[in-house]
């Protein structure tokens, strides 16, 4: 057995290295930032939002997918709520809505108004019990109904009745747009030969397609979304509900992905044919052996990072972890030969760190603190000393792991503390804090991708794959890092992509 040399393994992180410039014939606007998230899913932006309860819920997941990335819904909530978030993302855009929200003639307008508010839609088809389309009710039909009459007025009294302008399933985009334009309507129901409602096309979906040309979508034109699960307790039930809700990616998300429980549930997911359409990401790991264990279990991508996050204390509480550049590189040694993409999760402070992660061997990066301050993250704005902030906490923080509601915390088993009997016996591996307000996600992603394109220009890489091949590191000293940042000056105007 080979003896381990405890001092022969040097760990480097993003501040320890720089990329070497090289000959280039690339300009930033020509750089292609698309990259593989999993074996089967490619993103136009290699950015993923972290599965944290102060980062990713439905609103963030929608924004990430529209801008070419992907959101991973956190699991520190009930199964019903997480599945509802998946459904909300999948319904937010669609080439054709295959299971549209509907109502009946006997429903009240108050019930329809509640449906429209819940799903953020302006109207619903009206069907019989057998699915036959009999009309449609929209905001225009309800506009002049007094609020006090909404509970007593029925849909049949105000709806637009058949015959409606409809189409058959299989109509192409141009044909649908032509019908919508010709008849000046916003919704086009799709029916079969018996007049039963099969789907719905809306003009808003076409507008969103034009507005977000690089959106991450499935084969049906719906936004893609990921969701996190654990391995303990209700993990399998959660996975099944997420599958039924239409999730595209399941992330088995724990602090140590090389554990037996994680490997077992990955194997179960990959062996169950009902999950064949869903890609499985496993994590987190920080070594070649950890990545290999997940690859052997059948993952479609490996997530790397033990303790690099700004709110994580694992490395000081447990004394365990590997600096992130080295961790990503080590994991890639196992993943690349197997054709498995690598996700660098945590520790990224600037856009330049994204390029460093990709050169180290990652295919995409997962962001927490860089997105926690955006409009789309959960939580309210905090005003402090004339500046705006938003809350941000680690999933290993005491607040995230404490019991809630039915004496349940869905974050405990991420840190393998599901068996801890009371809150005062928890061992936190994270902190709670706040980050500066950054505005909308689209603005932050624009700056991050712009920085990545600049990296590709400097290294002469037109694609992420070229960046991974051409990129070369130089190790730097503490003095070199100091020189890399603005120095010997008092900054009076903040740049949108730099804070210190």
For each feature predicted by the language model, list its residue ranges.
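Bateman/CBS regulatory modules and CBS-like beta-alpha motifs in cytosolic regions of diverse proteins
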Residues: 29-43, 50-52, 81-121, 126-128, ...
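Catalytic cores of alpha/beta
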Residues: 59-62, 237-245, 286-304, 344, ...
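Short hydrophobic beta-strand motif reused across regulatory alpha/beta modules
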Residues: 134-140, 198-202
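Glycine-enriched alpha-helix->loop->beta-strand junction motifs that scaffold or abut catalytic
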Residues: 65-70, 244-250, 274-277, 296-301, ...
